[in-house]
């Protein structure tokens, strides 16, 4: 089948069959259900002789309450907490280890090392890590006690996991630690010295839930759930993930993998399942598939019954198994599918916006520049006879696997001929090819660049290598110079002090320059502000001047009014003069009358001597 490892459900001794081995009582004993300890050693050796590694499921998160187990081991709470809010797990009805006790921590760490030392296990997969990390896991308010900081993190369990990983990897025997952690706890696969828990891999439960939900949809409605297909790549490099379809997904009424697929017939369901497995193989991360799902077992897994091996007599199941076998061999023979699982340079979207067509196109790369695979996954029930897509470089593209091949139960809508790229821009790439895409299918192409493209890649690779070498040599030279200086300083005991004094002097000069610059800038700002204030001050003065001028104009306006008053008085005098003329009997020259200022009283007093009076008046006028 081409598998590289097998992961066994817990083989430690346990009393309850229905627990599947997850309620362990004999941590240091292989279960007697399958034979003796020697039989188990033989099994491990045989698997290794066939090139298959063995990973064991291990349960340090909780243990059963059975009296013949670890509960109240000596009549007191030795392994568990005395306070039931800390030591009881209501979700499973089991007890929780007191990880803060050194005796308990050492017991569990020694047990993990026991299985790698005595039985040569290639890895340990830890169950229910999330229940260890959170004090309130599976509990209601009032059923748990906060940590010393008032939070829900189990600080003692966190330290236990870090200590375990440090000791485990300190053996340097190549064994790996895998965490089944279903929350967003950060740095599960980070190094303990960097604040991580120290695991090598983490199950990607988020991808499993999203992708399973997407595949359950009818193909017509998948375009509305396109995000469930592509979302995982947003966090794919936050941890070292393993993509899993485990036993938890095919029990408790969830149905088998083929049972989750839409389709009116078993063949249609198998068509969807093949596309799903193809996408899983191309997606970054290690892969895990539960037994029976590689030949499309119809029923859920039942711990009380064997797998339905008889189904292999039917073509659809045999063809599904052949397809999974082909995928596994493709995985093992192409480093692009595993070498750069946790390096963003190993993956590139060609197009992840075909939501209306329910398609994704991407490439996988290896550490070698010429190792590239192109994946085209169609989750829609529509076929594309001439589908153009962008390719990463000019070259030849050969289809090496197609889930719609007749040998796997498909319709045979494949691409038997090698495709040569054309210099036609597509998907924002300079080159493109045209292929046939079957409905519900996944096809994989090997990519061979042209000689010119190879030369360009080699030149780029040479430049990159040269740059890296130069940086390394420069760093080495700097390191060597620093070491020489350190040695000289150690010998003389003076150079270090001089360097410090010199550096302090340089810093002092720099600070002095900065201070001068700061003072100058402050002075400049102050002068600018003074100028602005002066300008603002002159403006009121101008306004005052304008106000005075306005007052003068108002005064001038008043003077004409005075003149008008005088004019009225003259008019009154003229009226009186006319009246005086009427009183006189003599004729008077108009010119003389108009210029005289006559007093009416004098004119009327001497009526008998008019000539004398008028002559006198004439002299006064002159």
Annotate the PLM regions.
Residues 1-153:
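Substrate-binding/active-site clefts of carbohydrate-active enzymes
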Residues 12, 31, 60, 130, ...:
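Short, flexible loop/turn elements at secondary-structure junctions
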Residues 1-2, 267-270, 281-289, 293-511, ...:
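Carbohydrate-interacting/catalytic domains
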């Amino acid at each position: 089948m081409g598998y590289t490892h097998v992961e066994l459900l817990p083989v430690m001794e346990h009393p309850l069959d229905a627990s599947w081995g997850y309620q362990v009582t004999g941590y240091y004993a292989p279960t007697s259900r399958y034979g003796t300890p020697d039989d188990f050693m033989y099994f491990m050796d045989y698997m290794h002789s066939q090139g298959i590694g063995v990973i064991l499921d291990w349960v340090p998160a909780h243990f059963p309450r059975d009296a013949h187990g670890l509960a109240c081991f000596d009549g007191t709470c030795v392994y568990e907490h005395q306070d039931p809010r800390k030591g009881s797990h209501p979700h499973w009805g089991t007890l929780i280890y007191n990880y803060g006790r050194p005796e308990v921590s050492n017991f569990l760490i020694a047990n993990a090392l026991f299985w790698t030392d005595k039985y040569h296990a290639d890895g340990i997969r830890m169950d229910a890590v999330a229940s260890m990390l959170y004090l309130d896991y599976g509990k209601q308010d009032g059923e748990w006690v906060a940590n010393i900081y008032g939070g829900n993190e189990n600080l003692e369990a966190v330290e236990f996991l870090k200590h375990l990983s440090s000791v485990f990897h300190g053996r340097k025997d190549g064994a790996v630690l895998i965490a089944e952690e279903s929350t967003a706890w950060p740095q599960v696969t980070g190094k303990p010295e960097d604040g991580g828990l120290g695991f090598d891999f983490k199950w990607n439960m988020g991808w499993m839930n999203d992708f399973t939900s997407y595949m359950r949809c009818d193909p017509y409605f998948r375009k509305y759930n396109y995000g469930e297909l592509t979302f995982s790549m947003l966090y794919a490099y936050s941890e070292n993930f393993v993509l899993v379809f485990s036993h938890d997904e095919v029990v408790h009424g969830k149905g088998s993998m083929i049972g989750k697929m839409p389709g009116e017939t078993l063949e249609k369901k198998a068509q969807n399942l093949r596309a799903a497995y193809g996408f899983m193989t191309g997606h970054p991360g290690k892969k895990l598939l539960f037994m029976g799902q590689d030949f499309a077992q119809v029923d859920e897994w039942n711990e009380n019954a064997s797998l339905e091996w008889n189904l292999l007599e039917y073509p659809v199941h045999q063809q599904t198994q052949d397809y999974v076998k082909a995928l596994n061999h493709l995985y093992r023979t192409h480093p692009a599918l595993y070498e750069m699982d946790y390096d963003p340079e190993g993956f590139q979207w060609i197009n992840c916006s075909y939501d209306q067509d329910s398609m994704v196109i991407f490439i996988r790369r290896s550490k070698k520049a010429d190792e590239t695979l192109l994946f085209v996954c169609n989750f829609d029930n529509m076929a594309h006879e001439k589908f153009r897509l962008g390719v990463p470089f000019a070259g030849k593209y050969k289809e090496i696997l197609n889930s719609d091949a007749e040998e796997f139960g498909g319709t045979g809508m494949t691409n038997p001929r090698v495709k040569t790229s054309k210099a036609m821009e597509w998907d924002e790439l300079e080159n493109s090819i045209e292929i046939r895409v079957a409905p519900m299918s996944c096809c994989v192409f090997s990519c061979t660049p042209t000689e010119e493209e190879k030369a360009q890649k080699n030149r780029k690779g040479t430049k990159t290598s040269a740059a890296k070498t130069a940086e390394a040599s420069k760093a080495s030279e700097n390191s060597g110079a620093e070491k020489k200086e350190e040695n000289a300083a150690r010998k003389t005991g003076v150079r270090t002090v001089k360097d410090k004094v010199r550096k302090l002097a340089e810093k002092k000069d720099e600070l002095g320059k900065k201070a001068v610059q700061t003072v100058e800038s402050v002075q400049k700002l102050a002068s600018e502000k003074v100028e602005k204030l002066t300008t603002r001050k002159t403006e009121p003065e101008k306004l005052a001047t304008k106000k005075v001028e306005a007052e003068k104009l108002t005064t001038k306006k008043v003077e004409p009014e005075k003149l008008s008053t005088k004019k009225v008085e003259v008019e009154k005098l003229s009226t009186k003069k006319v009246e005086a003329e009427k009183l006189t009997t003599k004729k008077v020259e108009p010119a003389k009358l108009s210029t005289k200022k006559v007093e009416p009283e004098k004119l009327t007093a001497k009526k008998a001597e008019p000539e004398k009076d008028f002559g006198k008046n004439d002299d006064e006028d002159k």
